[in-house]
């Protein structure tokens, strides 16, 4: 019996920030169900695929009933009766149906929900795990990065840098690495509490203490790592995501950072000094604004041989924009966010481009998440090498890490473990 798509049904659910988002069910003719929920970002790149919101008074204008209607209407009509096993064909059908460059007519949140749910339905129909369906037999567990201190738009902490992350560069297994991070997380909480600092968590499960500066935050991480019994840089490394587009002044072409106005050159000097002072700092994401390609390229030239430089807002997981970045020598790694581009197929294309150009890849969650663990399977399937999906708190974050534990258990001790820098 040929299995085809029988029904596609979307609904409005709520994400981890209490905002509406899209969930999609794809039902196949063999009775199989695939379900997927779409995340949403707080700091977004200007050229990201468009998340269709309703506007108006209901739910502060953030309702997604239009996107839901597009799934239940046009998209369902276009895809019903199609085979679920040709992901690229179905994704391109939806792209053509939308007819815009940024998926603004139907909504990237509508299209991505269907794209993810189709692949999950196909995997379920084949009775194999999603990671196996997407990746075949060649699989690898990624290097995880944990956002343990939140700043920027993810928290009201007064720190301009948005994320301070730690990663277990020395680990025997995924579980071993996760246990190390759990130890540091609880140690960090105690250190903050002992200093009389806030231990409430931000959007991504990290703490949001008023530490006053980037250096204070990194120094506190060093203290937590050492107090937990590990060696900074050797066993546990540090990464930051300044999300600098958020503090870049487009008119004056300066960065309003920690009470100063910095030129691109001055900000680069700041990063160089930071890496020299804290050698455990091995990765900087979006150190320069998405509108400051020259600054980003200058950083890549100056620091690209020493540390990882990740492009997020500047590339927005868009293969065409990424090609431009490769030509201009911008960054040496790319962040992959499924909802930035809006289909599974295009995200895979961006990863393929990165591989050919010698760029590292890091899969990422969004600050508005759901308990859907799709990106965990996706990271394993794609040999992505790295993932960041929050801290060791908030179930929508921890669920992704728990999925890696399940995958590691299923694949056994022989499963490949990505290393940094890989």
From Swiss-Prot:
Pathway annotation from the record: Carbohydrate degradation; glycolysis; pyruvate from D-glyceraldehyde 3-phosphate: step 4/5
Enzyme Commission no: 4.2.1.11
Major place of residence: cytoplasm
Membrane-crossing residue ranges in chain numbering: none
Catalytic activity of the protein: (2R)-2-phosphoglycerate = phosphoenolpyruvate + H2O
Cofactor note: Binds a second Mg(2+) ion via substrate during catalysis.
Binding site residues for (2R)-2-phosphoglycerate: 162, 337, 366-367, 388
Keywords: Cytoplasm, Glycolysis, Lyase, Magnesium, Metal-binding, Secreted
Positions bound to Mg(2+): 241, 285, 312
InterPro entries: Enolase, Enolase-like_C_sf, Enolase-like_N, Enolase_C, Enolase_CS, Enolase_N
GO molecular function: magnesium ion binding; phosphopyruvate hydratase activity
Biological-process GO terms, alphabetical: glycolytic process
Enzyme class: lyase
Co-factor requirement: Mg(2+)
Domain of life assignment: Bacteria
Its biological purpose: Catalyzes the reversible conversion of 2-phosphoglycerate (2-PG) into phosphoenolpyruvate (PEP). It is essential for the degradation of carbohydrates via glycolysis.
Family (UniProt): Belongs to the enolase family.
Protein name: Enolase 2
Lineage: Bacteria, Bacillati, Bacillota, Bacilli, Lactobacillales
Gene name, Swiss-Prot/TrEMBL: eno2
